[in-house]
Amino acid sequence: KNFRWNASFNISRNINQIERLSEGKAYLEGDLWWMQEGGRIGDFYGYKYINVFQYDESNAFAEGSWQQLTPVFENGVFQNKYLLNGTEYTGKVLQKTLPNGKPFRGGDINWEEPEGSRDGIIDDNDRMIIGNALPDVTGGLSTQFTYKDWSLFISFYYSLGGEIYNFGEHNRNMFKYTGTTPSPDVIYNTWLKQGDIALY
């Protein structure tokens, strides 16, 4: 009689869909959130990262499929040959470029192009939905223990799903500010020279 224990649990699922927009036109909110009929509130919109070009010659793709080719080197010298899935490629070699025609080089990011927009030119047409900020499931758990005139209340909150856009880390790792040190992950995994296998 002197001891009591109460517990409660709740769970909810977040399902949303944009049914109608003014004039039915999709638009970009704040250069990050993509709003379109049939889409979801909280959709991130941007470029999708594939990898970092290891060499200048790594910016090479097979005609038609746009599969990335592997340049062949011997003693550090490019042999003017490429492999596709381990086999020598003899077709036309395509490159990805900026809108001004400048090709990407070693150390640049290899951005994905969506189906239907694969022309090798990385521009606004290559931005796509890359995630959603809203969790799929949220809920809570609370419990209370009471003994005579003493009580202890504990509460937990949880969420599952949903991506996080860390704006602070983005600015920290952009090398925009002289007094800011990038994160160790960026420091140790940044491309510095031809042949480096890097993430950034």
Language-model segment annotations:
Residues N2-I129, N173, P184, Y188-Y200:
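Conserved small-residue
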Residues W5-A7, L141, Y147, L152-I154:
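Transmembrane beta-strands of outer-membrane beta-barrel proteins
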Residues F3, P135-G139:
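Residues that define the transmembrane beta-barrel architecture of outer-membrane proteins
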Residues D123-D126, T138-L141, T146, S159:
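Short, hydrophobic/aromatic alpha-helical segments in well-folded domains
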Residues I11-Q17, Y147-D149, Y158-G162:
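Transmembrane beta-strands of outer-membrane beta-barrel pores
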Residues L152-Y200:
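C-terminal beta-barrel architecture of Gram-negative outer-membrane proteins
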